[in-house]
Amino acid sequence: METPRLMCTQHPDSTVKVPVQEEVEEAVRSFLVYGCDEVMSDYEGKLTPYAQPKEIVVKAGELGVPVGEGFYVTVRAPNPRLEDFDRVDLALEAAVLANYYSYKRLGVQAVRWVVLPMTDSAETVRLVQRLLARKTRVLCEEVGQPCEQAQLVPLLEDVDSLLRVREILRDLHSALAELGSDPGVLRVFLGKSDSALKAGHIASALSLLYALGESAKAGEELGLEVKPILGGGSPPFRGGVNNPRLVGVEVQRYRGYSTVTVQSAVRYDASFSEYQEVRSKLLGGAGGEPGDAGGRVAELARLAASMYRSLASKYLDFVNEYARSVPTTRDRVSWREYGRALELEDKLFSAPRAIVYTAAWYSLGVPPTFLDADFVLEAYRGDFLDEVLGYLPGLEEEWRYDAQFYLPRLAGERLGEELVKKVDEALDAMGLRPEPLEPYEKLARTAPAELRALLLGKVRGFLG
């Protein structure tokens, strides 16, 4: 069985609203029109119907999609540490139920993987994998369907977890062995967005490079294949892998992924010809050997994370205020109920989820990529900026891309001149001169607050 290469997701990063009632049809279009061989049915912080995975399987099967044979439905379940246990239980039940119907109608297993977000402990991995195995066993014993259990896919979404990927893969392998399973392949999901929110763009990018290399080493150690899923979106801060302007440099940087996410913005805010070009480059980059992420990668990631948190935490009150006007383009639980936290020393600062956070920073006139300004200046003055650029080819191109959305006068009015001065100095250190798009700056100043984030997103080609 081949591992899927393109995973279409339900991320709310587009300016086009997709209500939950349309997501089954959307999943089928993802197979037939967008050429994804895997679709994610997402329950994390989201109001997804219990029967959605089953309905995708049934509808796709009716339209001739060979679900379970080259095309798969993957469920993202909530993490029981972060959401109510009944939501976790029902999401796992939904995955098992979808397989019941896929066996009954098509004779194959459609849901082979269940993603566990925010994975950071062996205990949670073991708990969820055990629950999944027991639910599968009960159904197969009672109705006679095959007892192939879906495999847990840990989603690592912070710098610390990404740097510990080998340890987490050992724990997953051990948990599967305890349940009598001996897989030849493990998948691990490496997330760019939340790790960037918590630690900044540079730290998350460095950690991702490290995790891709360590995943390959873990496979050698365990005597199996590890197939990483690269999770990223359109803005540089969230990975840039779906961005028509940046996808070429991103697939070179993040070599070693087997699967990559295709999020909503590139499907709905880009032209279809642009989408096809992105898809082609993503497929061309899949399955390559990871680059060398040795040297000081982990050390630099931790330093960059610390400096980003010190800077970003000063402005979170402004970000949280502007986040209220960012529209919701999926039926998700409000970020005020299910948000994120930015940790600085012994304090936790409340923040929106990554897409809303990203959109809010753009609305304030500062692309969140530039929140690494202190680190860039430290690297420049300490004469190790070239070392950082060597690890992160394309960083200059990302900053050049985001410079067109940097509005220093507006940012100075809303956030103060101190941040603007730092960003200007960092851009100068990178050899870049910002040239804001004129219509973009005009919209940022004159659009009504409730429409501003959406209209700016339409110009950029992504909400956040």
Curated annotation (Swiss-Prot):
<keyword id="KW-0460">Magnesium</keyword>
<dbReference type="Pfam" id="PF14010">
    <property type="entry name" value="PEPcase_2"/>
</dbReference>
<dbReference type="InterPro" id="IPR007566">
    <property type="entry name" value="PEP_COase_arc-type"/>
</dbReference>
<dbReference type="GO" id="GO:0000287">
    <property type="term" value="F:magnesium ion binding"/>
</dbReference>
<comment type="function">
    <text>Catalyzes the irreversible beta-carboxylation of phosphoenolpyruvate (PEP) to form oxaloacetate (OAA), a four-carbon dicarboxylic acid source for the tricarboxylic acid cycle.</text>
</comment>
<dbReference type="InterPro" id="IPR015813">
    <property type="entry name" value="Pyrv/PenolPyrv_kinase-like_dom"/>
</dbReference>
<keyword id="KW-0120">Carbon dioxide fixation</keyword>
<dbReference type="GO" id="GO:0015977">
    <property type="term" value="P:carbon fixation"/>
</dbReference>
<comment type="similarity">
    <text>Belongs to the PEPCase type 2 family.</text>
</comment>
<dbReference type="GO" id="GO:0008964">
    <property type="term" value="F:phosphoenolpyruvate carboxylase activity"/>
</dbReference>
<dbReference type="GO" id="GO:0006099">
    <property type="term" value="P:tricarboxylic acid cycle"/>
</dbReference>
<protein>
    <recommendedName>
        <fullName>Phosphoenolpyruvate carboxylase</fullName>
        <ecNumber>4.1.1.31</ecNumber>
    </recommendedName>
</protein>
<comment type="subunit">
    <text>Homotetramer.</text>
</comment>
<keyword id="KW-0456">Lyase</keyword>
<dbReference type="GO" id="GO:0006107">
    <property type="term" value="P:oxaloacetate metabolic process"/>
</dbReference>
